Amino acid sequence: MVDSKKTETPQVVDASKKAENSKTSQAGRIQFLSAPKQFSASDVRSSPSLADLDEIAYEVRTTSIASPAEIEAVCQLWIRNTEIPADKVALIAIDMARAYADVGASRKAVLLDAPTLAPTVARSRLAQLKAGAGISPRQFCSYYAKIVWNLMLHKNEPPANWAKIGFKEDYKFAAFDFFDAVDSPAALEPSQWVRHPTDKERAAHGVVKWASLSRERLQEGTSITTVAELNKGHLGGYNNLPALMAPPS
């Protein structure tokens, strides 16, 4: 008796051809995905590749830190108007920033003595000339923050007033008011580091800075008049440190 059902012949598929077709298809998809539109610098909607971004020569700048050109202008003022040796001017600039670390980098700061490399030129005179370049002591010092940090560690000489302003001994090297510029890419980079600041040193500086600003706010007070009957003769705040605001989270 003959089976009426049609016998199906199995199809033999070449495994090597199947794998080759799969690879070809996959390669085509990869090529399609990795071929973005060509970047056009005249089209603001065009997205640049990493290679395109290499054309941008950006210099990190911030208004809180003097630029190399501004520091150079200060040094030229010193050379033209004083007897400092031109071949030592960079070291004298660092000496000035180190002196500000002891007394505070503000226009009210009184700089003492003279740099050892220019013993006939008072630091106070150099500070006056620096003001003529249009940059503040804080901007000037912040440029050298990393160098000053290195110098103090290298010589084991912390800022003079570290205990007076409330730092513990473990964090005393962070006790200068332009310390936050040590982490800024806009500050002059040392050729080598003694060490980088620790997180605890950063935190200690932040807390003491916050406390100092709070003290100033309390001393300023909230009075809007000088009439003695109203302010009872007080010109500053009535509260002391326990009344400080909560520290920032």
UniProtKB/Swiss-Prot annotation:
A GO cellular component annotation in the UniProt record: helical viral capsid
Keywords linked to the UniProt accession: Capsid protein, Helical capsid protein, Ribonucleoprotein, Virion
Span list, region Disordered: 1-28
Pfam families, per database record: Flexi_CP
Function comment: Required for genome encapsidation. Forms ribonucleoprotein complexes along with TGB1 helicase and viral RNA.
InterPro entries: Pltvir_coat
GO terms for MF: structural molecule activity
Entry's family note: Belongs to the potexvirus capsid protein family.
Protein name: Coat protein
Cysteine pairs bridged by disulfides in the record: none
Protein location: Virion
